[in-house]
A protein has these predicted regions:
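Phosphate-binding glycine-rich loops and adjacent basic patches that engage nucleotide phosphates
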Residues: 2-11, 22-32, 82-90, 111-117, ...
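Extracytoplasmic/periplasmic sensory segments of membrane signal-transduction proteins
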Residues: 36-131
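Extracytoplasmic/periplasmic ligand-binding sensor regions of membrane-associated signaling proteins
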Residues: 104-164
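Juxtamembrane extracytoplasmic/periplasmic/luminal helical "stalk" adjacent to the first N-terminal
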Residues: 1-63, 148
C-alpha cells in the first residue's frame, strides 16, 4: 500500500528545504559580489584622494598605476585620465593605462583622435555629476578591447582658475 499523504508531505518538506537552500545560496552569493564591488571601489577612491593632494610626475603616475594593477587581482586595468592639456600643456591626451592580458601587465596610453576618452561615458558622466559612477557594461574598443564595467572617480588639481 502507498500512502499518498506521506509522499505529498515529504515532497512539501523537500520543496521547502530547496527554497531555503536557494535563498541562502543567493544571499551568500550576493554578499560575496558586494564584498568584491566594495573592494574594487576603494581602489580608485584612494587614488583620487592621493591625486587631489599631490602633484605627481609622469614616472610617479606610471608606477602608481602599474602597482595598482599588479597588487589588485580583482581589477582588469586602471587609468588616470586627465582633461585635455591639463597634465601637459602641449599634449591634448594624457591617460596612461595598465591592464592584464594573459597574466601579464601591459601598458598603453589611451587617447587619440580615434579614441577621445573624454567623450566616453566612463569619463564624461562622473565629471558631469561630480561623483563616482559605475558604467553600464560596454565593449571598450581601443583600450581594453573587452567587455567591461568601469568604476570612475573624478579627481581635481589646483589650476590657474582654481580647482580643475
Amino acid at each position: 500500500m502507498i500512502d499518498n499523504h506521506n509522499s505529498k508531505k515529504i515532497r512539501s518538506i523537500f520543496k521547502g528545504n530547496l527554497r531555503v537552500s536557494a535563498k541562502n545560496l543567493s544571499h551568500s552569493t550576493l554578499n560575496k559580489i558586494e564584498s568584491i564591488i566594495k573592494a574594487v571601489e576603494k581602489i580608485p577612491q584612494q587614488m583620487a584622494l592621493s591625486l587631489d593632494d599631490s602633484s605627481y610626475s609622469k614616472e610617479e603616475l606610471l608606477l602608481l598605476l602599474r602597482k595598482t594593477v599588479e597588487n589588485n587581482p580583482e581589477i582588469y586595468g586602471s587609468t588616470i585620465a586627465f582633461e585635455p592639456y591639463m597634465f601637459d600643456a602641449d599634449s591634448r591626451y594624457f591617460a596612461p593605462y595598465y591592464y592584464k592580458n594573459d597574466k601579464e601587465i601591459k601598458f598603453t596610453f589611451i587617447g587619440s583622435e580615434s579614441y577621445k576618452y573624454f567623450l566616453w561615458d566612463w569619463y564624461k558622466i562622473p565629471k558631469e555629476k561630480n561623483q563616482s559612477v559605475w558604467s553600464e557594461p560596454y565593449f571598450d574598443e581601443g583600450a581594453g578591447n573587452i567587455i567591461m564595467a568601469t568604476y570612475s572617480v573624478p579627481f581635481y588639481r589646483e589650476g590657474k582658475d582654481g580647482r580643475e
